[in-house]
Curated annotation (Swiss-Prot):
One of its GO terms (biological process) is response to bacterium. It is an enzyme of class 2 (transferase). It comes from Arabidopsis thaliana. Disruption phenotype: No visible phenotype under normal growth conditions, but mutant plants accumulate high levels of glycerol, can grow on synthetic medium containing glycerol and have increased resistance to salt, cold, osmotic and drought stresses. It catalyses: glycerol + ATP = sn-glycerol 3-phosphate + ADP + H(+). Its EC number is 2.7.1.30. This is Glycerol kinase. GO terms for cellular component: cytosol. The gene is GLPK. Keywords: ATP-binding, Cytoplasm, Glycerol metabolism, Kinase, Nucleotide-binding, Plant defense, Transferase. Induction: By the bacterial pathogens P.syringae pv. phaseolicola, pv. syringae, pv. tomato and pv. tabaci, and flagellin. Pfam families: FGGY_C, FGGY_N.
Length: 522
């Protein structure tokens, strides 16, 4: 990329933390700040966030990152051209447009409280859990925003009353942040982008607008929904009271779509982001592909109001890095997440132990809300290193399950190979710093894994979207620059095919052991 003065900022609002990163014209991070926030677990299977705490975390991250950039000699004042925003998807907020206050804590994407609503709809609607797939690409599941919104409408009196009074508005985290950053109760913009909207189960994938039949079927009033915009356009300006008033918000994507853009994935290329969960997306180009193997049809990105829409197949895994957090916080096997690599490397195998982290059920490609976690194959020989390695393997097995489904769905309709005839999985996210995890992934797939120099591509993707909208970058800068690829690390498979097949068969047996466990009682 040609050098040019100026910077792009990126808000990365994730499941467990918020970050703000400032990039220069060469897409290099020059400063960043990260803040963790509180996770609430009011009941088994429930996960909530405080929207006000998230809002404050964004303010703090912006201010601190600006201070760091200035302290390091970067002329950010007057040089920040725009900001992009990426967020945890599906997490649902309903708030009062008159007071600006949330009417309930945010219900997080992995929250499973809506299982009874899902079962009810599956029985009532033709096609069962696939009733809405034709229009929105998604099955009926606790995962998506529509079910969370229905729960709030049915169970929270403040939400019911506000809807009756015309005072309630709904949004995912991007909508909540943009509304507050552009004025809040004083004219804040009520918008979302096409990728976040595609995860609500309410947007028609072909028209990219709210699906009126779906709204009618579910009884959701259209007036509480935000306007849908593309991923790369000037949405509005940041209001007074924020560290960067007057700066344009020019890009917005859900986190996994941002990572795909950050990895510059073209048609036929896939990426896997390893975070709290793991999310694998395959860019299928301009035509949505309907999955017959447990995947979701969704958007990849739309880089401008008049730009073509790129679609994707997605496999969403609920628990990946969260299993490592569980080892740390609940079992005390490790003191920090980074310790798991050395602990797992103390043994050459799991010793026959298989761990399936179905804490709140299983997502793609199994879609079993009745599943619960299991750890099998334990003997007196088993020690904590075997458990740690089994946890790492569980992340990789789940990714392989999704990739196998992608190959079945898209193998004939879209290329899954590069010019050398091999499949490459591009990876990103904090957990990919774990070299052992990446080698296990390559071994279990039997294919190379490519890790970029900057593994936090989610924030980079949001920055790219904003930079494109204001002319800071061109698409060629993103999709044709080979500089990042030159420095990528490639992990190649070293496991014998016979061993791989045996391990995969054992994993599938372990997964089956998780089924029908949700109703177990003491």
């Amino acid at each position: 990329m040609a050098k040019e003065n100026g910077f792009i900022g990126s808000i990365d609002q994730g499941t467990t933390s918020t970050r703000f990163i400032i990039y220069d014209h060469d897409a290099r991070p020059v400063a960043s700040h990260q803040v963790e926030f509180t996770q609430f677990y009011p009941e088994a299977g429930w996960v909530e966030h405080d929207p006000m705490e998230i809002l404050e975390s964004v303010k703090v991250c912006i201010a601190k990152a600006l201070d760091k950039a200035t302290a390091d000699g970067h002329n950010v004042d007057g040089g920040l051209k725009a900001i992009g925003l990426t967020d945890q998807r599906e997490t649902t907020v309903v708030w009062s447009k008159s007071t600006g206050l949330p009417l309930h804590k945010a219900i997080v994407w992995m929250d499973a409280r809506t299982s009874s609503i899902c079962r009810r709809l599956e029985k009532e609607l033709s096609g069962g859990r696939s009733h809405f797939v034709e229009s929105c690409g998604l099955p009926i599941s606790t995962y998506f925003s529509a079910m969370k919104l229905l729960w709030l409408m049915e169970n929270v009196d403040d939400v019911k009353d506000a809807i009756k009074k015309g005072d309630a508005i709904f949004g995912t985290i991007d909508t909540w942040l943009i509304w507050n950053m552009t004025g809040g109760i004083n004219g804040g913009l009520h918008v979302t982008d096409v990728t976040n909207a595609s995860r609500t189960m309410l947007m028609n994938l072909k028209t990219l607008s709210w699906d009126q039949d779906t709204l009618k079927t579910l009884g959701i009033p259209a007036e509480i929904l935000p306007k849908i915009v593309s991923n790369s356009e000037v949405i509005g300006e940041i209001c007074k009271g924020w560290p960067i008033p007057g700066i344009k918000i020019a890009g917005c994507l859900g986190d996994q779509h941002a990572a795909m853009l950050g990895q510059a994935c073209r048609k036929g290329e896939a990426k896997s982001t390893y975070g709290t969960g793991a999310f694998i997306l395959l860019n299928t180009g301009e035509v949505p592909i309907k999955s017959g193997h447990g995947l979701l049809t969704t958007l990849a990105y739309k880089l401008g109001p008049q730009a073509q829409t790129n679609y994707a197949l997605e496999g969403s895994i609920a628990i990946a890095g969260a299993a490592v957090q569980w080892l740390r916080d609940s079992l005390g096997i490790i003191k920090s997440a980074s310790e798991i690599e050395d602990l797992a490397a103390m043994v050459d195998s799991t010793g026959g132990v298989y761990f399936v982290p179905a804490f709140n059920g299983l997502f793609a490609p199994w879609w079993r809300e009745d599943a619960r976690g299991v750890c099998i194959g334990i003997t007196r020989f088993t020690n904590k290193s075997h458990i740690a390695r089994a946890v790492l393997e569980s992340m990789c097995f789940q990714v392989k399950d999704v990739l196998d489904s992608m190959n079945k769905d898209a193998g004939e309709k879209g290329s899954l190979n590069n010019g050398k005839g091999e499949f490459l999985l591009r990876v990103d996210g904090g957990a990919t710093a774990n070299n052992l995890l990446m080698q296990i992934q390559a071994d279990l797939m039997g294919s190379p894994v490519v890790r970029p120099v900057d593994i936090e591509t989610t924030a980079l993707g949001a920055a790219y979207a904003a930079g494109l909208a204001v002319g800071f970058w061109k698409e060629a800068d993103i999709f044709e620059s080979g500089e990042k690829a030159k420095n990528s690390k490639v992990f190649r498979p070293a496991m014998e095919e016979g061993i791989r097949k045996k391990k995969v068969a054992s994993w599938c047996k372990a997964v089956e052991r998780t089924f029908d466990l949700a109703d177990l009682s003491i």
